[in-house]
Amino acid sequence: MTHLPKLAIVGRPNVGKSALFNRICKQKIAIVDEAEGITRDRLYAEGELFGLHFQVIDTGGINARSKEVFNEEIKRQAEIAIEEADTIVQVVDAHVGLTELDKEVARVLLRTKKPVCLAVNKIDNLSQTSLMHQFHSLGIKQMIPVSAAQGWQIAELLETAFEKISREIESQETFSSIKVAIVGRANVGKSSLVNYLLDEDRCIVSPIPGTTRDSVDISFTHKDECYTLIDTAGIRRKRAEHEVVDKFAAIRTERAIERADLCVLMLDVQEGITAQDKKIANTIEEAGQGCIILLNKWDLVQGFRMEHCLQNLEEEVPFLRHCPKIFTSAKTGRNIDKLFPLIQEVYANSQKRITTHQLNKFIGEALQKNHPPMIQGKRLRIYYMAQVAVKPPKFILFVNYPNLMTDTYKKYLYNQFREAYAFTGVPILIHLKGKTKKDKPVSSLSLTRKQTKSTDQENNEYDELYQEQRVSDEDYYFENEEDLTEK
């Protein structure tokens, strides 16, 4: 597995650590705000400088005097980052000047005997470098003036930080990992799950909602398979969105869902299905993501009955009926061993392809079992079906007139398709396409016999057809059996 050199960014609160982290990573990962204590967990991302790839770790502000409820946890997270880092950058604020907290942080870093570089932040040009002199007393020999906001001197800072780090740490081995977003409303146990899976306190765990504010990416290996867990900030009720940070965190959670390969939706069975749970479930569905549902804390409910919980879940979020469910306790690890096989299964299903030959055989058998009904003397005719995309699996069903497809028959086809191909944990998108000049009417019952060309030839021809045809007013689609709408 790749072992990249690690750079930890540390310092007192509100000196620009997260802004520097984002600048090095060249993307907005950490939430940046003027308020103190925004970053709480350790954030990891990959950076690159002149061909050298490395990991960057953003930490919360170290403040021994703070009364902030999470201060001890933030400090511990920073200490863990310092321990695992190969090189360290302490960030200070040139305009605020040297503070006692800066001195305390420097003393801690120098005791590690690791390479330490001082980033004197908020210096926009060389004319302001005189502001650096006050920091010489910290005892850190390597000092670089930088502007995280403007991107000035960032390359020079990184060169200095990695000057004494051997490139032998870095392996050129590449690997692909399955990105799994751990999502759910605030305080359902997401960080407890991540910490149990990793067997370390990577994320701050607290009964106070909103503990995790950033989306924390964590890469690791389990049974020779590579995974990246994305521990997201819980989406809270709207009344809490007066905090700008919580609003940013909710947006970051939605982005995490979009960039993940699949999602693990955590629910608290003690409180049942809430409006926030439904909102997150809808976000997963709209993103077309595969999903596994973890029903957490069921061991804390007296007289708990699984069948009642599953029935309630199906009634509240019927569009996730296809998703596998696990009753678990993230705190004790009960049934967590079932999660990884399901991740592999759902991920494989999201990329599964079915040949046009197999799909047309399926359509022929479905039509033989149950013919479409007559509508005003006309009957729906299905010409053929083909898959056009994966993640999520997407299919086009070519018919004579889409408006002849009744709701009952839509449900029938959907259920038959699920029964034939399962696609456990993955949404299925099936689009209806109206008749075009290129479609020759054929008997719907002859679909299983019309095999005059190879499957590969059919797939190539149909792929070209989809690219040429434009979506018309007659196009319809349905996602799962209950969500068929006109486009």
Swiss-Prot record:
Annotated binding of GTP 2, by residue: 184-191, 231-235, 296-299
Keywords carried by this UniProt record: GTP-binding, Nucleotide-binding, Repeat, Ribosome biogenesis
Record-annotated EngA-type G domain positions: 5-169, 178-351
GO biological process entries: ribosome biogenesis
Binding site for GTP 1: 11-18, 58-62, 121-124
Domain KH-like: 352-439
Gene3D superfamilies: 3.30.300.20, P-loop containing nucleotide triphosphate hydrolases (3.40.50.300)
A matching Pfam family: KH_dom-like
Chain spans, region Disordered: 441-466
One MF annotation (Gene Ontology) recorded for this entry: ribosome binding
NCBIfam families xref list: GTPase_EngA, small_GTP
Function: GTPase that plays an essential role in the late steps of ribosome biogenesis.
Complexes and interactors: Associates with the 50S ribosomal subunit.
PANTHER family assigned: GTPASE DER
Family statement: Belongs to the TRAFAC class TrmE-Era-EngA-EngB-Septin-like GTPase superfamily. EngA (Der) GTPase family.
Protein name (record): GTPase Der
Organism phylogeny: Bacteria, Pseudomonadati, Chlamydiota, Chlamydiia, Parachlamydiales
Gene: der
